[in-house]
A protein has these predicted regions:
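Structured soluble/peripheral alpha/beta segments that form catalytic or ligand/cofactor-binding pockets
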Residues: 1-168
Length: 168
């Protein structure tokens, strides 16, 4: 995977009548750091939004994690726009429940080899609040909140652009 994927955010949540699975994947340098959003939103078990081309991703309040050195967002937001309807799914981090440097448990020789080839992997798992809000003609018509768990995985070295992720 590390030859293709530089990093990703991945989340799944059930909120009121909604279920969402959302991910933003960034490719490695070999693929121009292209991004891909994978997104699904269902209401009462029926998929209502799954056209990735209609989804934007943004982060807010990004800071460098003290243990892993990776940029971590307090807020990740997926916005789905379709004609007059807009769905905004926001994950707001309250607790980081896991921070792992992927080589820290490896034998010394393997850690050295990983550094030499540029492997700088880290994994983060978060808990916090998820909010799903539906807008019709820019007026909020539904809003649900609940608890969620999501993750951030890094295979590659941190780039300066990672600290200010936004995707139109």
């Amino acid at each position: 995977m590390q030859t293709i994927i530089h990093n990703w955010y991945w989340a799944r949540a059930s909120v009121g009548p909604y279920t969402t699975i959302a991910s933003r994947i960034t490719a490695t340098a070999a693929y121009g750091y292209e991004t891909q959003i994978v997104y699904m939103l269902a209401r009462d078990g029926q998929i209502i939004a799954d056209d990735d081309a209609k989804v934007s991703f943004e982060t807010d309040r990004v800071a460098i994690d003290g243990k892993t050195g990776k940029p971590v967002a307090d807020v990740t937001r997926y916005t789905y726009r379709d004609t007059d309807a807009r769905y905004v799914v926001s994950f707001e981090r309250e607790t980081t429940i896991l921070q792992a440097i992927l080589t820290e448990r490896a034998p010394l020789l393997k850690r050295i080899m990983a550094r030499l080839i540029g492997f700088d992997g880290a994994y983060h798992r978060f808990t916090g609040k998820v909010t799903i809000e539906k807008f019709e003609r820019d007026v909020s018509v539904e809003r649900f909140e609940d608890r969620a768990i999501w993750e951030l995985m890094y295979f590659g070295k941190t780039r300066s652009q990672d600290a200010k992720i936004q995707n139109p």
